[in-house]
Amino acid sequence: FSWIGPKRLIPPAVPMAELPKVDVILVSHNHYDHLDIQSMKKIQARNSSLKVFVPKGDMRLLKKRGIRNVFEFGWWDSKQLDSVDFIFTPAQHWSGRGVFDRNKSWWGGWLIKTKLKSIFHAGDTGYSQDFLKIRSKFGPIDVAFLPIGAFEPRWFVSGQHIDPAEALKIAADLEVTKAYGMHWGTFILTDEAVLEARKQLIKLQTPAINPTRPIFTP
């Protein structure tokens, strides 16, 4: 990140130089821990045909910073590339990168569908009925990436960030085959310890409590 925004505790799992060809970047919302323009510039410099899919209201920000091939999406909007459907889905969160732009752009998750498989990334979200709607519209999800961290204190962040228990509820709502916990262990954003989300998720998924154990963490 630049001088604004949180600092990483660990480096990216895959160094920039080792990334394969990138066709599309999907942006869930414009918070600094989800939209890093310098990283996007580096990826675009290595991938001339790169397309960038963003929520409504974020195109101006990216174009102003030199990002090309930007497409805006509202909830349920979709675009097909090479027989792959990209659908922008609702979430319960907010947006803003400064003092005066709060909720000036949209936020959400992304569903990627091929003829054989579906992959869902929830973005940042509190718990809502949106996930039942996603399941109703598109069927059970094969693979989901669900946020589990940045959940304390609940009185303050419950409307915008789910906790590990709610992640399990969303996995059930979506009828996922396999899910992976994300949005933990990379930045210090809220009050819980860095590894607390993973610890709670493991505890909630002991065989005695939850035999199916649908969410995995590295």
Question: PLM features: residue spans?
Answer:
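Conserved phosphate-coordination/catalytic loops
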Residues: 6-9, 13, 34, 101-104, ...
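Cap/insert and terminal regions of metallo-dependent hydrolase folds
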Residues: 24, 39, 51-53, 57-60, ...
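Pre-active-site segment of Zn-dependent metallo-hydrolases
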Residues: 1-30, 40-45, 96-100, 128-139
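Conserved N-terminal glycine/acidic-rich loop preference
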Residues: 21-22, 30-36, 61-76, 122
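Conserved beta-strand hairpin/beta-sheet module of binuclear metal-dependent hydrolase folds
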Residues: 1-12, 103-123
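Metallo-beta-lactamase
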Residues: 54-117, 200-218
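Histidine-centered active-site/metal-ligand motif
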Residues: 29-34, 93-95, 121, 161, ...
